[in-house]
Amino acid sequence: MFSPRRLAAGLTFWALGSAWCIPALAAQLVRVGAAHFPPYTVRPEQGADTGLLPQLIVALNALQSDYQFVLVPTSIPRRFRDFEQGRIDMAIFENPDWGWQEIPHTAVDLGLEDAEIFVAQREPGRGQSYFADLKGKRLAVFSGYHYAFAHFNPDPKSMVEQFNATLTYSHDSNLLMVARGRADIALVTRSYLSDFMVRNADMAAQFLVSERIDQVYHHYALLRPKAPITGEAFSELLKQLRDNGQMLKIFEPYRIDITPAPRQ
């Protein structure tokens, strides 16, 4: 017969051993869609994304252990289907007005603002009035984007027929078309132009940049209804990144504004 003391010791050892065998609760996997949208996401399908989204994902994962954020490559047109079918849980750097109106989601304000601007070749006598009227001008735009001047209709046929636009999948190509006289105006994000000018400082003097803004990008994260993380929980993580300076570190170099307080 075991003595009470030996029995208690044995039970304690068993309890400790059982606890050691129980694995810690695994972090919940949150799949974030990554569609080519430079400088935010750059060719994610190639597996070496150098954009801002991977930096944000690294910061989110370093901040906590409850969720593991991972990137899932998608595309501008396919991201809607991937979202609805649950292949991705979240789309980041989005706007609810960019074709999401009929798709159930929760919108979380990222507290980030960028802008779409016009860029032309600098010529003697050409000033800001050049951007006032787009009629008759050859435009270079990014295929699939929702532009304010086109009433947010990304249809390629409409862009070509109504706005004499050349559609590409490269902002660099669009800017080079302007530099080489193959297009009159290119539309790019302020953040991308800032990065382009750093990489191509010798070309900066060739371009006339508009004061006119096609649209202001107020960025959101869109969460599907059954996402592993709630809008409130994700908002709290973003707040912590703002408070510890990570948001500023990631986005300020690209002239992406950190707004005073996210609008929820």
Q: Each predicted region: which residue ranges?
A:
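Short loop->beta-strand "edge-of-pocket" segments that line small-molecule binding or catalytic clefts
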Residues: 29-43, 50, 131-148
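Periplasmic-binding protein-like
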Residues: 34-38, 113-117, 202-238, 257-264
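Extended ligand-binding regions for polar small-molecule ligands
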Residues: 54-64, 124-125, 131-138, 145, ...
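Ligand-binding cleft/hinge of the Venus flytrap
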Residues: 57-65, 109, 135, 143-168, ...
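Acidic, polar ligand-binding/catalytic clefts
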Residues: 58, 71-133, 146-147, 212
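Alpha-to-beta junction loops
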Residues: 66-67, 84-93, 137, 170, ...
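Short helix-initiation/N-cap motifs at beta->coil->alpha
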Residues: 70-81, 164-176
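A ligand-binding cleft/hinge motif common to bilobed small-molecule-binding domains
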Residues: 81-84, 92-103, 184-208, 212-215
